[in-house]
A protein has these predicted regions:
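Accessory "access/gating" subregions that flank catalytic or transport cores
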Residues: 6, 11, 111-119, 130-138, ...
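An N-terminal structural lobe/cap that precedes and organizes the functional/catalytic core
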Residues: 2-63, 78-80
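Long beta-sheet-rich domains in secretory-pathway and surface-associated proteins
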Residues: 357-462
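Acidic, carboxylate-rich catalytic segments that either coordinate divalent cations
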Residues: 4, 198, 204-219, 224-229, ...
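Short, non-ligating residues that shape and space the ligands of small metal-coordination modules
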Residues: 475-478
Length: 487
C-alpha cells in the first residue's frame, strides 16, 4: 500500500505557520474576548508590541513536554498528572473544575464532567494543534488524542467534540486544502447530533446558500448563542464563517473575530488552520511584525522550561512528529509530498475516533505497572447511604478478575469477576477510598465521594481565586506567601 508521504521542508514550514497563526489570531482576539455582539475589526486593535499570553498555546506547551518525556501515546492519567504539575493554577471555568475534582481524589474522565457546568466550553478545542501536528495526515489518530486531552475537563461535553473536530481538520490540512473536504473530515469524527456539529453545518449552509455574512452571523447567534461567551457551540459556527466568507489570511481572521464571543479562541484556532494551509508565505508581514516570534507565557503555566520562540517550538514539534510517524505504516516523511490515489478515503477513516468517543466518561482511570485500570461508577462517583451502587473494573479495556477493598461499614457484594454492588447503611464520609487489586497489576486506589462532598456547585460560578494573583486558591502563585488559602 502506498504511503502518504509528507515533504519535510513543507511540513516544517506549515508547523511554523500553524504556531505563528495561533499567536496572531489569539493576539487579535484577546482584547475583545467576551463581547457577545458583532465587531468591526480590520487589524489588531490595539496594535500590540508582542504576542498576548494565551492559554490556547500555553497548555499545548505542557503537552509538548509530556510527549517529549513520555512518548507519542501517553495514557490519560499522564495527561492529568502533567496538568496538575504545570497548569494547576488556572482557575477559569472548566480548568478550575477539573482541578477541583482532581484535588478531591477523582480521576478523569469523570473528573472532567462531575459538577462541571463548563464541559461545553472552548477550553479544549483550543488545544487541538499539537495533536494535529503530531499526527499530520492521520486525522483519526489526531482526533483520538484530542479525546484524551478533552476528557480532562470537558468529558462528554461539546468541548470534547470541538477538539476532536479541529484536531482532525488540522491534521488533514497538511495534505488537503479544500475547505469543504476538511470540514467533512472533521465532522466524520464527532457525533452527528452534537450541537457543535449542528453549528458547523449551519455555517456551511449559510455560505452555500448565499446568505450575507451579517445575516449568517445572526443566524448562528440566534440559533446557537449562549449566555456564556466561551460556549463552544456558537464559536465553532463563527470560526467556520470566518474561514468560508473571508478572502485571505487577515480578512478571514477578522471575519471570525468580528462575530464576537470567545474571540481569542476563534481567532487563534482559525489562525492555526490558515497557517497550516498557506504556510509562512500565506501570512502577510503586517500581521507578523507587531508580535514577532517570541512566546509569551502566562504566569499560570509554570514549573518547566518551554520553548522561547515559535522557531524552537517548531523544531521540537517536528522532531516529535517524525518520531510518531516511524511507527505508522501509512504515513512517512520524505523529500517531497506524495499522495496515494485513495488519500481522501484514508482521511475520512474514523475508527479510532468512533472508538474513543464511545468510551464511558463516568469512570476514573489510573495507571499501575504499565496497565490502565478503570473504575466505572455507572454515573456520579458518589455513594449515598442506604442505596446500593453497582461499579465495575476494566484493565486495559477488558474485564478481569479483581478484588475490591472498601471502607469499614461498607459491603461490596460480588456480582461478577469485576463487578460489585457497593452499599453502606451508615452515613458515608465525604471522601472514601476503595482499592482495586488484580494479579500482575497491584493495588490501585480510587475515590468515591459521599453526599456531603457532592452538594453541587452554582451553575456558571467559578472556583475560588486568590484576590491578588487570581490563581486558584489552592495553587496561589503569590511570592512571599499569601493568606488566601485560609479564607
Amino acid at each position: 500500500m502506498d504511503r502518504i508521504v509528507i515533504g519535510r521542508k513543507a511540513f516544517r514550514d506549515k508547523v511554523f505557520a500553524c504556531w505563528l497563526g495561533k499567536n496572531i489570531g489569539g493576539t487579535l482576539g484577546a482584547p475583545h474576548e467576551g463581547k457577545r455582539f458583532a465587531l468591526a475589526l480590520d487589524f489588531y486593535d490595539p496594535v500590540p508590541t508582542k504576542a498576548a499570553a494565551n492559554d490556547d498555546l500555553d497548555l499545548q506547551l505542557v503537552w509538548l513536554k509530556l510527549l517529549e518525556d513520555e512518548g507519542a501515546d501517553p495514557p490519560l492519567p499522564r495527561l492529568a498528572e502533567y496538568w496538575s504539575r504545570y497548569a494547576c493554577s488556572y482557575p477559569w471555568n472548566e480548568y478550575g473544575f477539573f482541578m477541583r475534582n482532581w484535588s478531591r481524589g477523582l480521576r478523569p474522565p469523570v473528573a472532567g464532567c462531575f459538577e462541571n457546568y463548563f464541559v461545553d466550553e472552548m477550553g479544549s478545542p483550543i488545544r487541538s494543534e499539537i495533536w494535529a501536528c503530531l499526527h499530520a495526515g492521520d486525522p483519526q489518530a489526531a482526533s483520538r488524542m484530542a479525546w484524551k486531552d478533552s476528557a480532562l475537563d470537558h468529558a462528554g461535553g461539546e468541548g470534547m467534540w470541538g477538539e476532536m473536530f479541529w484536531a482532525a481538520v488540522e491534521a488533514a490540512a497538511f495534505v488537503e486544502s479544500d475547505p469543504m473536504v476538511l470540514i467533512h473530515v472533521g465532522l466524520a469524527m464527532i457525533p452527528l447530533a452534537s450541537h457543535v456539529a449542528r453549528s458547523i453545518r449551519e455555517a456551511v449552509w449559510c455560505r452555500e446558500n448565499g446568505l450575507p455574512l451579517g445575516d449568517a452571523r445572526e443566524r448562528i447567534a440566534g440559533r446557537f448563542g449562549h449566555l456564556q461567551p466561551c460556549n463552544a457551540v456558537p464559536n465553532h459556527g463563527f470560526t467556520i464563517l470566518g474561514w468560508l466568507y473571508g478572502k485571505d489570511f487577515g480578512d478571514r481572521l477578522c471575519k471570525a473575530v468580528n462575530c464576537g464571543y470567545d474571540t481569542d479562541c476563534t481567532g487563534a484556532t482559525l489562525g492555526s488552520l490558515l497557517g497550516i494551509l498557506g504556510g509562512p508565505a500565506g501570512i502577510p508581514a503586517k500581521w507578523r511584525e507587531p508580535i514577532g516570534t517570541a512566546i509569551v507565557l502566562h504566569p499560570f503555566t509554570r514549573g518547566f522550561k518551554p520553548p522561547a520562540t515559535i522557531e524552537e517550538l517548531t523544531e521540537r514539534t517536528v522532531a516529535l512528529s517524525e518520531k510518531a510517524a516511524t511507527g505508522k505504516h501509512e504515513i512517512a516523511f520524505g523529500a517531497k509530498t506524495r499522495l496515494p490515489e485513495d488519500v481522501l478515503t484514508r482521511l475520512f477513516r474514523n475508527d479510532l475516533a468512533v472508538t474513543a468517543r464511545g468510551q464511558d466518561v463516568h469512570m476514573g482511570v489510573e495507571v499501575c505497572g504499565g496497565r490502565e485500570v478503570a473504575l466505572h461508577y455507572g454515573g456520579e462517583p458518589v455513594l449515598r447511604p442506604g442505596i446500593g451502587r453497582t461499579v465495575w473494573v476494566m484493565i486495559d479495556g477488558r474485564e478481569a478478575h479483581v478484588e475490591l477493598a472498601v471502607p469499614a461499614g461498607w459491603t461490596a457484594e460480588r456480582l461478577g469477576p469485576a463487578r460489585f454492588r457497593l452499599f453502606s447503611a451508615e452515613p458515608v464520609a465525604d471522601r472514601n477510598q476503595v482499592t482495586v487489586t488484580a494479579p500482575g497489576v497491584g493495588a490501585v486506589p480510587f475515590t468515591v465521594l459521599g453526599p456531603g462532598e457532592a452538594k453541587g456547585f452554582p451553575a456558571g460560578d467559578n472556583v475560588a481565586k486568590c484576590p491578588k494573583c487570581q490563581a486558584r486558591v489552592e495553587a496561589c502563585i503569590c511570592e512571599g506567601g499569601c493568606s488566601c488559602r485560609a479564607k
